[in-house]
Swiss-Prot record:
Entry-linked NCBIfam families: PPR (TIGR00756)
Organism: Arabidopsis thaliana (Mouse-ear cress)
Keyword Metal-binding: no
PPR repeats: 87-121, 122-152, 153-187, 192-226, 229-259, 260-294, 295-330, 331-361, 363-397
Disulphide linkage map: none
Keywords: Repeat
Gene for this chain: PCMP-A1
Protein name: Pentatricopeptide repeat-containing protein At1g31790
Family annotation (InterPro entries): Pentatricopeptide_rpt, PPR_At4g14850-like_plant, TPR-like_helical_dom_sf
PROSITE patterns (alphabetical): PPR
Length: 409
């Protein structure tokens, strides 16, 4: 007789919910396995040979798909069905959840639920609701709530102000700042330097030069210039650069005893915008002499400036060597600028080396830059080959390159 090993069917697994409030999803874990083996041993005659054991393997239990995360609306409905009263702690958690998930519907239902409740919200709690609506992109609701607030603190003003900046409503942001300034003069709060930096950005966007100059004077009055705040200094340099006042921008830079990367990057941007390409290269050299760290923005503007300097690409090669030394050559934007610069000077082989050194084969800008370099130097066959490779890879080429390729074909 042969020996049989029988595996009973698995018992139903117990569902143990695993909630993780720090993650974006909740999962229902299931790692339960059952294995009840029963063996029936029968006497075997001596004249029979032993046969192999037949094993019926137990099928593995597949884990269930993770359950979807409960939304703010679901929790509010559950509270209503159980007649659970709400409080500021619960509502604050739900407001934070709606803000993180950009849940406009949940934010609206939470607002209605709070209005129907009997709680008397504090300023801190209302600020949480303001932040929720701003995060959900509802600046209109935020302004309505803000305008109806009988008392406001600095956070109330800052949330609405930054919401206007984030949404691109720069005129309203400037108007809010003027109102905030009047409110702060009553001793309610002090305006920090980063608010003034944001106001300067708004002034540049709405082309209000006079208001920006008044903000600069306010920076002196409040002592922020003496503190040499890097963000504020960079904002001032960018502001004057937007209005093509390079002398004023450079004066702000030279007044700094320890100008950092932010301030110098703003100066490099201003000089490139005004077509001062030699000055951009001098800025780059000056940063190196003073030991100031360079960032991607600085390298990008300097390489673009090198494309317009008639030196056969020598300046660009030196900047390239510096980029390799500091580890910026692997950046997608820097590689694109290098390909454009080498293509401008007819150094196609150098452009190809930069292009082929990339480990990321899906960089659209680098592929288009390499095609443009080929066409710029009359190497249309290689350009068309590269366009076919882009099509096979699923990379979209610029329409101007495609039109020029069709003309050459």
């Amino acid at each position: 007789m042969k020996t049989l090993e029988l595996a009973l069917p698995p018992s139903p697994p117990s569902l143990v919910p695993s909630f993780n409030y720090n993650s974006t999803a909740r999962s229902v874990g299931n790692d339960v396995r059952t294995n009840f083996d029963v063996q029936l041993f029968l006497r075997k005659p001596k004249h029979q040979k032993s046969e192999p054991v037949v094993v019926i393997q137990q099928p593995q239990i597949q884990p269930q798909n993770p359950s979807s995360r409960c939304s703010t609306s679901d929790i509010l409905r559950l509270m209503d069905s159980l007649s659970l009263p709400g409080n500021e702690d619960i509502y604050s958690c739900l407001a934070k959840e709606s803000a993180r998930e950009n849940d406009q519907r949940g934010a609206h239902e939470l607002q209605v639920h709070i209005m129907k409740s009997s709680i008397r919200p504090t300023i801190t709690f209302i600020n949480r609701l303001l932040l929720m609506h701003v995060s959900c992109g509802r600046l209109d609701i935020t302004r309505q709530m803000f305008d109806r607030m009988p008392h406001r603190d600095f956070h109330s003003w800052a949330i609405v102000f930054l919401g206007c900046i984030e949404m691109g409503d720069y005129e309203d942001a400037a108007f809010l700042f003027v109102s905030m300034l009047k409110h702060s003069q009553k001793g309610a709060f002090k305006i920090p330097s980063w608010i003034l930096g944001c106001v300067l950005k708004a002034c540049a966007m709405i082309r209000d030069f006079e208001l920006g100059k008044q903000v600069h004077a306010l920076c002196h009055k409040l002592g922020f210039i003496d503190e040499e705040d890097s963000y504020l200094s960079g904002s001032l340099i960018r502001f004057y650069g937007e209005f093509r006042c390079l002398e004023d921008a450079n004066l702000v830079l030279h007044q700094l005893s320890n100008a950092n990367t932010v301030a110098w990057a703003a100066k490099v941007t201003n000089d490139y915008r005004e077509g001062e390409f030699q000055e951009v290269i001098r800025d780059f050299i000056e940063m190196g002499n003073h030991g100031i760290k360079k960032n991607v923005s600085v390298f990008s503007n300097v390489l673009k400036a090198c494309s317009w300097v008639s030196d056969g690409g020598r300046s660009g090669q030196q900047v390239h060597a510096n980029a390799i030394k500091l580890g910026f050559e692997s950046d997608c934007l820097i590689r694109c600028r290098l390909i454009e610069m080498y293509g401008k000077y007819g150094k196609v082989k150098d452009a190809e080396k930069v292009f082929k050194s990339s480990k990321d084969e899906t960089s659209v800008s680098c592929w288009n830059a390499m095609v443009a370099s080929y066409m710029q130097n009359g190497i249309y066959i290689e350009a068309i080959k590269l366009l076919y490779q882009m099509k096979a890879t699923g990379i979209k080429a610029h329409d101007t390159l495609l039109n020029e390729a069709h003309l050459q074909m």
